[in-house]
């Protein structure tokens, strides 16, 4: 008889829940709920389990916020809870609450070739560290290492490191944004809101007044090639994505590969392929040769957060991935 666990991927707006076959890791019966419709995450879980008439003893839910202890307070939502109390209330034997990019990193060993698009470099080296990052509402970062037949995710808040310009144009953008917002992190330029910041800074650098555009507007105008400022912002976004990925590669020696997740890049995939992304990745001066062979992959799996939550839980329960 198949034994299932509950897995989830929760962001600021939606909660996506599914079942994971503990033996195989297969994800099934995924359903998305609006977080605005429920008073708590526990309430959503109860609705899901009732709707699917399933009894589970174990669960793992990825959440887009730092996880530093038993108390979890979501960054972009009003939900807050005790992991221990939620586990007790649901009657679970195991309940893991992990960072969303911990889940994405744990999905990597489970991905197949059809779930990846490669951007330069050679073949990944088995046993070497892996980096994963992705731009969406924010900029998520994690690393992954393989030790004693176990995958260990190293989460953090790498998206909030300083934005490090490496050209006159990037330095000008830093100056403009710093005057507006103070500290300029990488996330301030590598995210949906970050794309807007790039566009606004480019226009303001020419002493013009920027329009009030959304990330979607900037992307659409750039792809239609009817707004030079939007196209420049998107081009610069791709280059800076490359620079940041190269920084991650240098920091951990990620010869196991660098992986890109998140919802932004797939929206302009062909543009990204033709951009200066890989050039930015390898633009490391004396260490260009060091990163030249490191492969970069775009994850195109539909639900890496659910897949990785399942992988994390299965490993916790003693399965070898």
Curated annotation (Swiss-Prot):
Domain of life of the source: Bacteria
Keyword Protein biosynthesis set for record: no
InterPro entries membership: ATPase_NBD, Bacterial_glucokinase, Glucokinase
Coarse class of the protein's main subcellular location: cytoplasm
HAMAP family according to UniProt: Glucokinase
Species in which this protein is naturally found: Salmonella heidelberg (strain SL476)
Keyword terms: ATP-binding, Cytoplasm, Glycolysis, Kinase, Nucleotide-binding, Transferase
UniProt entry tagged with the keyword Kinase: yes
Molecular function GO labels: ATP binding; D-glucose binding; glucokinase activity
GO cellular component, one term: cytosol
Protein's name according to its UniProt entry: Glucokinase
Family: Belongs to the bacterial glucokinase family.
Compartments it resides in: Cytoplasm
GO BP annotations listed: glycolytic process
Binding site for ATP: 8-13
EC number: 2.7.1.2
EC main group: transferase
Catalytic function, reaction form: D-glucose + ATP = D-glucose 6-phosphate + ADP + H(+)
One family name in Pfam for this protein: Glucokinase
């Amino acid at each position: 008889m198949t034994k299932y666990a509950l897995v989830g991927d929760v962001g600021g707006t939606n909660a996506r829940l599914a079942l994971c076959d503990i033996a195989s890791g297969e994800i099934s019966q995924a359903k998305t709920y609006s977080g605005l419709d429920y008073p708590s995450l526990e309430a959503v879980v109860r609705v899901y389990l009732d709707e699917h008439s399933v009894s589970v003893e174990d669960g793992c839910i990825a959440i887009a916020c730092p996880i530093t202890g038993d108390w979890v307070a979501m960054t972009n939502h009003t939900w807050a809870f005790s992991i221990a109390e939620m586990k007790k209330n649901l009657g679970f034997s195991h309940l893991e609450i992990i960072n969303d990019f911990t889940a994405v990193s744990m999905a990597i060993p489970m991905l197949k070739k059809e779930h990846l698009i490669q951007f330069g470099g050679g073949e990944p080296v088995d046993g070497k560290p892996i980096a994963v990052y992705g731009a969406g509402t924010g900029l998520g970062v994690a690393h992954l290492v393989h030790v004693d037949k176990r995958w260990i995710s190293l989460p953090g808040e790498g998206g909030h490191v300083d934005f490090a310009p490496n050209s006159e144009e990037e330095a000008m953008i830093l100056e403009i944004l710093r005057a507006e917002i103070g500290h300029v992190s990488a996330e301030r330029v590598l995210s949906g809101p970050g794309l807007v910041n790039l566009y606004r800074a480019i226009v303001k650098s020419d002493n013009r007044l920027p329009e009030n555009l959304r990330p979607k507007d900037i992307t659409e105008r750039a792809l239609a090639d009817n707004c030079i400022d939007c196209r420049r912002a998107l081009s610069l976004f791709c280059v800076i994505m490359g620079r940041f990925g190269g920084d991650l590669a240098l920091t951990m020696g990620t010869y196991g590969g660098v992986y890109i997740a998140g919802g932004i890049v797939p929206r302009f995939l062909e543009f990204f392929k033709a951009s200066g992304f890989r050039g930015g990745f390898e633009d490391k001066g004396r260490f260009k040769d060091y990163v030249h062979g490191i492969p970069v992959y775009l994850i195109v799996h539909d639900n890496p957060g659910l897949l990785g939550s399942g992988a994390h839980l299965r490993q916790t329960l003693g399965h070898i991935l």
